[in-house]
């Protein structure tokens, strides 16, 4: 296996909010992709695929909500050091829970 270099992102941001908005835009793009897959499965009556995709629909809804919440928090705290410190602590305390997909 040959590991290749990961290219530097070609995006530049002029504010702290812009990367969060880009992240939310990407999450919305992923939602659209999942929805197209779901619609295709529905069109051919592939109910097992639809059942599997239900999990992705739910998870993606949570991802969009998280991205949106980050933007709201940035608007709320802005450049307030104490607020940003508290927000940073809150994000650090979040525990990863491995997703489970019913089979």
Q: At which residue positions do the language-model features occur?
A:
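Iron-associated oxidoreductase/ferritin-like identity signal
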Residues: 1-103
């Amino acid at each position: 296996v040959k590991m290749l270099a990961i290219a530097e992102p070609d995006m530049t941001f002029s504010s702290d909010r812009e990367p969060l908005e880009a992240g939310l835009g990407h999450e919305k793009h992923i939602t659209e992709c999942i929805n197209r897959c779901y619609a295709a499965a529905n069109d051919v009556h592939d109910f097992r695929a639809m059942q599997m995709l239900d999990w992705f629909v739910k998870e993606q809804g949570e991802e969009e909500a998280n991205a949106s919440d980050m933007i709201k928090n940035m608007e709320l705290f802005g450049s307030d050091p104490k607020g940003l410190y508290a927000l940073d602590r809150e994000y650090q305390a979040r525990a990863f829970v491995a997703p489970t997909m019913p089979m």
